[in-house]
Curated annotation (Swiss-Prot):
Described function: May act as a component of the cytoskeleton or as a chaperone for the reorganization of intermediate filament proteins during terminal differentiation in the lens. Does not seem to have enzymatic activity.
Gene name tied to this protein: Lgsn
Annotated InterPro entries: Gln_synt_N, Gln_synt_N_sf, Gln_synth/guanido_kin_cat_dom, Gln_synth_cat_dom
Name the UniProt record assigns to this protein: Lengsin
MF GO annotations: glutamine synthetase activity
Lineage top rank: taxon: Eukaryota
Provenance organism: Mus musculus (Mouse)
Tissues with expression: Expressed in lens.
This protein's GO CC annotations: plasma membrane
Length: 563
């Protein structure tokens, strides 16, 4: 929204840790330069890499162990509390930790949650794997992808021969690609030095997300984090915000196990697309007969590292549901982000339009099913172990936090006018708000506590719509839950034996987008957790969208581009 000079001045007190990000990125570049050179410069350089691996590792370890280095990112110290990388499972198999040329499998990679927190042997093994994948699949291009505020993938495709250089130095992209809004001088956010609003940003790839795309010919993708040209993280980046909240959760002694459940609609595509001719493919009419499309999508998602637990037809014609397997850390949001792009590309191969947009009469949900575990990922902190429908005190505190902030959460999780219709779809009364409901094993509630044994004890946050940015849904959920955990007396959670929660005032969800935006602006906890810079920008963007809301006909005209 503004240039980073302003952001640094305005948010220094609330976004501690950003000062050292520039030096960390510089260290990371140096480490990548050392490790990637023997693997990617030449297909014949493998013997040189092996001969020099011991000396290279010693030098890199000495360099990376310095304060502020890439290796120090996995530290649990308080001064690093705001670093965006959650280290959920820090232990490494001896084979990978001991040898640069150890076998690497992307689907069993133990460092997949420790993004960019690699030591030299890990980084070397990962780069070797990437080189092998590029050669085996004859890759010609690599997409460097980042999410915008709406959760849409924005990318630059790089010829494969330049991949090594871009891993080290990053890919430059105009900032306006990710922050889709006119110049802040003409809007709510007006700062003195906003002239740099249209400056470039840098996409730095997270190598753990490198995958060959089965639905794109000879193309791979890597998900990127966004930085300014001076090395600071972009404070409006949804992925950065999500990582920062996960790190806060880890510092509190927990980690997040989560998965998204999405509904989406499949439309048939006539020769001319308009609001009257878009139709449903008959084969998807409350059935699973359209297997080839769904099977190709699910198999493709698996190849990109996103494991699908199940898929089925949903409640309405042409509406499908897809459920991901739970994963620790940022992976669940990465999987949802991958789905949003892959769904579109696979659908076009079948001459379909697949849309996450909520049309009149349809309720495309984006549920975040989640639980918190101890930092080692061994114990579900929501499970009482009694075999009855009951949350632990920790679980009830977390739930109390979600209820407390539900009004502000709804703004981030149902970010469009049509999204909010689902909150009152069963009511004919004209209201300004509806209660935030919760219950045990009750799918009609906004917050549904599923007690299906120890591993199945989880909270389904059903406030979200499929159009919400998955990184923001995850970040806001963690921020609200953490506030509940950190409540001083725990009175809101009630006793450990009780199933009930004590609420001084019933939680309400605003039905109007304007009221939800006001609730978000007034929620000091979420403002501090997500950053005032982000909140200021998000609110200004939504107000601009409300002022320029398109008609249904215009929306249908460009339906194939919406997700």
């Amino acid at each position: 929204m503004t240039d980073e000079g302003d952001l640094a001045q305005e948010d220094t007190a609330k976004d501690e840790g950003n000062v050292t990000e520039g030096s960390r990125m510089s260290k990371l570049r140096r480490a990548r330069r050392k490790v990637t050179k023997p693997h990617l410069c030449s297909m014949d350089g493998e013997e040189i890499a092996k001969a020099n691996s011991s000396e290279m590792s010693r030098n890199q370890i000495a360099d990376l162990s310095k304060p502020g280095s890439a290796e120090s990112w996995s530290s649990h110290s308080a001064k690093d509390a705001y670093h965006p990388t959650p280290v959920v499972k820090p232990s490494l198999p001896s084979a990978l930790a001991g040898a640069p040329d150890a076998e690497f499998s992307p689907n069993t990679d133990p460092t997949r949650y420790n993004a960019q927190s690699f030591n030299p042997p890990q980084l070397s093994a990962r780069m070797k794997h990437i080189k092998q994948e590029m050669a085996k699949n004859h890759l010609q291009f690599v997409r460097f992808e980042a999410t915008d505020l709406h959760g849409v993938s924005r990318s630059k495709s790089i010829p494969a021969q330049f991949f090594q250089e871009k891993v080290i130095h990053g890919v430059f992209m105009p900032r306006g690609y990710l922050e889709l809004m006119p110049n802040p001088k003409d809007n709510e956010v007006n700062h003195i030095r906003a002239t740099c609003f249209n400056s470039d940003i840098v996409l730095m790839p997270e190598l753990s997300t490198f995958r060959v795309l089965p639905w794109a010919e000879r193309t791979a993708r890597v998900i990127c984090d966004t930085f300014t040209v001076t090395g600071e993280p972009l404070l409006t980046s949804p992925r950065y915000i999500a990582k920062r909240q996960l790190r806060q959760l880890q510092d509190a002694g927990f980690c997040l196990l989560s998965a998204f459940i999405y509904d989406f609609c499949i439309f048939g595509v006539p020769e001319v697309i308009n609001s009257k001719t878009i139709s449903f493919p008959a084969s998807t009419l409350l059935s699973n007969h359209d297997q080839p499309f769904m099977q190709e999508l699910v198999e493709g998602l698996y190849q990109t590292g996103a494991n699908v637990e199940s898929f089925s037809s949903s409640t309405r014609p042409g509406q499908m549901e897809i459920c991901f397997l739970p994963e620790f850390g940022i992976s669940s949001a990465d999987n949802a982000f991958t789905l949003r792009t892959g769904l579109q590309e696979v659908a076009r191969r079948y001459n379909y339009i697949a849309s996450l947009v909520i049309e009149t009469g349809f309720c495309n949900s984006g549920i975040l099913s989640h639980s918190i575990w101890d930092v080692g990922g061994k114990t579900n902190m929501f499970c009482s172990g009694s075999g009855v429908e009951r949350l632990t005190l920790t679980g009830k505190k977390w739930l109390a936090g979600l209820l407390k902030h539900s009004a502000a959460l709804s703004c981030l999780m149902a970010p469009a006018v049509n999204c909010r219709k689902r909150y009152c779809k069963d009511s004919r009364d004209l209201k300004d708000s509806v209660p935030t409901t919760w219950g045990y094993n009750d799918n009609s509630c906004a917050l549904n506590i599923k007690c299906h044994g120890e591993k199945g004890t989880q909270i389904e946050n059903k406030l979200g719509s499929a159009t919400a940015n998955p990184y923001l849904v995850l970040a806001a959920t963690v921020a609200a839950g953490l506030d509940g955990l950190q409540s001083s007396d725990g009175a809101a959670a009630g006793s450990d034996e009780s199933q009930d929660l004590y609420q001084p005032e019933p939680s309400e969800i605003p039905l109007k987008m304007e009221d939800a935006l006001a609730a978000l602006e007034q929620d000091e906890c979420l403002k501090q957790a997500l950053g005032e810079t982000f909140i200021r920008y998000f609110v200004a963007m939504k107000k601009y969208e409300l002022e320029n809301e398109e008609t249904d006909a215009e929306g249908n005209k460009f339906l194939e581009y919406f997700i």
